[in-house]
Amino acid sequence: MQIKIKSKEKYLIGVSGGSDSMFLLNKYKNQDVIVAHINYNLRPEAIFETLLVSKFCQKYNLELKILSFDSFKIKKNLQSGLRLGRYQFFEKIYKEFNCTKLLVGHHRDDFLETVFLQKKQKKIVTFWGIHKKNNLFNMEILRPFLYWRTKKQIIRICQQKKIPYLDDQSNFTGKYQRNQIRFLLEKKSDFSLFFLFLFYYLINIFKLIILKNQKKILQNWQKTGYNINFFKKIKIKSKIIFLFVNQNFDNVKLTRGKINEIINFICGKSTSGAFLLKKNNYIIKKKWKILPKSSKI
């Protein structure tokens, strides 16, 4: 079911000009909203997307904030750089207008694409796909259509209701991993895709129950001051280390091998030492306790 929007709240809506975000904007255009649009200046046709969003907002008297982003300044990992720039822009507007939620147009296909991307990258996950609600960059993010609309449905409704949109043509090339996964999923029947979604949706319910128990164990360990002897008695050490690192450090890539190295470091005979997670980020072993530190002491 669709999440109900409370009229007393103020929403920031991220709008690219594509079918997903324009469908979302049209749905909530009569609510108290601020519209945020970014022109990444990567494609000549991007200006037409900006004009489309501007025209729609003018028609319905919606507040619009536009960022012209210099994507060519990003030297490494373009996708990560664009994502960071996007959310920093959203955060600025969110604070400026005292918004209560950021709405984005993710749908069921995005959920499945993320699942298969996680599998392809062999990521350790506590949740498959995308969360319907989460907090990021000090914003509460809501994806109203994540579980109940597909890309096909959104395009069909946009065409029926004459909602204007211009989909990013780079989404139809095989340049990015996500696009490659999208092409594979498009070959599957609607029934197969729904079954896949339902399968991972139910797995996530089970995962969240397990995660709740794991967080309790982590909290109990934390209460001991991260005592090493307490940790040695924990049966699911790898799960707890995964949570411990993600709770105390930012942007640390964890593999199963690295988690095992951390466990061996903690449980080793030495009573002191430092384990380097990444530059200036260490797990310190001192007096039978573990200390998460952003710089070595």
UniProtKB/Swiss-Prot annotation:
Residues that hold ATP according to the record: 16-21
Pfam families from the UniProt entry: ATP_bind_3 (PF01171)
Catalytic activity from the UniProt record: cytidine(34) in tRNA(Ile2) + L-lysine + ATP = lysidine(34) in tRNA(Ile2) + AMP + diphosphate + H(+)
Class of this enzyme: ligase
An example Gene Ontology biological process: tRNA modification
Statement: the UniProt record of this protein carries the keyword Transport: no
Tagged with keyword Nucleotide-binding: yes
Lineage: Bacteria, Bacillati, Mycoplasmatota, Mycoplasmoidales, Metamycoplasmataceae
The enzyme's E.C. designation: 6.3.4.19
Subcellular location: Cytoplasm
Coiled-coil ranges (or none): none
Xref: InterPro entries: Rossmann-like_a/b/a_fold (IPR014729), TilS/TtcA_N (IPR011063), tRNA_Ile_lys_synt (IPR012094), tRNA_Ile_lys_synt_N (IPR012795)
Gene3D superfamilies: HUPs (3.40.50.620)
Principal location class: cytoplasm
Function field: Ligates lysine onto the cytidine present at position 34 of the AUA codon-specific tRNA(Ile) that contains the anticodon CAU, in an ATP-dependent manner. Cytidine is converted to lysidine, thus changing the amino acid specificity of the tRNA from methionine to isoleucine.
Protein name: tRNA(Ile)-lysidine synthase
Family from the record: Belongs to the tRNA(Ile)-lysidine synthase family.
Domain of life: Bacteria
UniProt entry keywords in alphabetical sequence: ATP-binding, Cytoplasm, Ligase, Nucleotide-binding, tRNA processing
GO CC terms in record: cytoplasm
UniProt comment concerning the protein's domains: The N-terminal region contains the highly conserved SGGXDS motif, predicted to be a P-loop motif involved in ATP binding.
UniProt GO molecular function: ATP binding; tRNA(Ile)-lysidine synthase activity
